[in-house]
């Protein structure tokens, strides 16, 4: 980890990170983080009863548990704005909301109606304007006019699915769904699967998302703000997430080790100089501290922050290159999966930029109208 941050610091005058995803590999000695969090979230409907430690409340927006039988959101109401009457309601036509109408539940309903949550994304995805049922086309081919085509309503206690079809092309379906949602206090509950993955998610107020899988491996999607400047700010954001995450784990699984790690993490946060932060991170790696010793890069992107004032020559890019140009002038390096990958493509990017500058200078010095076609091909296509 310290080597990655050291290199990102070396190039931060030219490149800035955009997407940054990483994993914390599960450790048997830590315990069943997933199982204990699942138990706590499943049994409670008040945020304070899930997250006891009030010091970390401002950092956590909500927790989500999703498996085949249940999806449950526990929200921290204090992290949401007060809505006015003109605030846009996003999802009324997708959900039937049941609530006990208490003040707490009514506030949760208000938030749910206006937030673009994963439930809204899921129900929008499963509502399909047009879907071809190839099995029914096969019936038409082999069964003639007597083939049966389904249209109508299928429903259970929590999900109603309406299938409509055109009489002339009955194998083309329009599918619409409505989901029942129960809201009690800070909890938003629906039954059945509402996600591709079975995970626990912790959504931070800074938009970072932590996904915890069944084996307690974690996937962390680190958010990016416009005011993030250089590697030192990135380290502070990551370790701020660590600090609050580890205190949450200590709170829920009652393992004092996480409190100790949170204290070590806090030393990184309070250090003011980058060299000091990197030194502390290296020491954490040497002592096999959770969060550093089990850190593994998932994927990250870099963007070239300087302006490209010269002509861009796309022919210099390999077909499978991770160097991409967007809108003609924006250079990004995408899908980097290791420090070695990063060093390799930054080097290629630097060399390519120099070659483009040279070609651009030559191109600007010649008369395009009188120059030979072969010469122009050499400049533009090779």
From Swiss-Prot:
Segment forming the signal sequence: none
Highest taxon above the source species: Viruses
InterPro entries in alphabetical order: Poxvirus_intermed-TF
Keyword flag Transcription regulation: yes
Keyword annotations from UniProtKB, A to Z: Activator, Transcription, Transcription regulation
Pfam families: Pox_int_trans
Family label: Belongs to the poxviruses A23 family.
Annotated function: Acts with RNA polymerase to initiate transcription from intermediate gene promoters.
The protein's assembly and partners: Heterodimer of a 45 kDa and a 32 kDa subunit.
Name under which the protein is recorded: Intermediate transcription factor 3 large subunit
UniProt source species: Camelpox virus (strain CMS)
């Amino acid at each position: 980890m310290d080597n990655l941050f050291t290199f990102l610091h070396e190039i931060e005058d030219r490149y800035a990170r955009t997407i940054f995803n990483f994993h914390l590999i599960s450790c048997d000695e830590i315990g069943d983080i997933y199982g204990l969090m699942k138990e706590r979230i499943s049994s409670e409907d008040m945020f304070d009863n899930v997250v006891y430690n009030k010091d970390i409340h401002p950092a956590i927006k909500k927790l989500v548990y999703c498996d085949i039988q249940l999806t449950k959101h526990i929200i921290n109401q204090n992290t949401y704005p007060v809505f006015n009457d003109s605030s846009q309601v996003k999802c009324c036509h997708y959900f039937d909301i049941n609530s006990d109408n208490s003040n707490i539940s009514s506030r949760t309903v208000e938030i749910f109606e206006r937030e673009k949550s994963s439930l809204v994304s899921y129900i929008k995805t499963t509502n399909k304007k047009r879907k071809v049922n190839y099995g029914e086309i096969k019936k038409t081919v082999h069964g003639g006019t007597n083939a049966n085509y389904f249209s109508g309503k299928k429903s259970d206690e929590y999900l109603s699915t309406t299938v409509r079809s055109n009489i002339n092309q009955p194998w083309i379906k329009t599918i619409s769904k409505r989901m029942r949602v129960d809201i009690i206090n800070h909890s938003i509950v629906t039954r059945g699967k509402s996600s591709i993955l079975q995970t626990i998610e912790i959504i931070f107020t800074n938009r970072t998302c932590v996904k915890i899988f069944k084996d307690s491996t974690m996937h962390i999607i680190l958010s990016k703000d416009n005011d993030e400047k250089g590697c030192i700010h990135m380290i502070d954001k990551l370790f701020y997430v660590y600090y609050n995450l580890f205190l949450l784990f200590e709170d829920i699984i009652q393992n004092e080790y996480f409190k100790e790690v949170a204290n070590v993490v806090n030393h990184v946060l309070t250090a003011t100089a980058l060299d000091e932060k990197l030194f502390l991170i290296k020491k954490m790696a040497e002592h096999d501290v959770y969060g550093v010793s089990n850190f593994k890069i998932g994927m990250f992107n870099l963007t070239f922050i300087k302006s490209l004032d010269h002509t861009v020559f796309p022919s210099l890019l390999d077909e499978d290159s991770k160097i991409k140009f967007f809108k003609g002038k924006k250079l990004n390096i995408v899908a980097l999966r290791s420090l070695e990958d990063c060093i390799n493509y930054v080097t290629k990017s630097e060399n390519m930029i120099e070659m483009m500058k040279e070609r651009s200078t030559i191109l600007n010095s010649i008369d395009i109208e009188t120059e030979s076609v072969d010469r122009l091909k050499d400049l533009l296509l090779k």
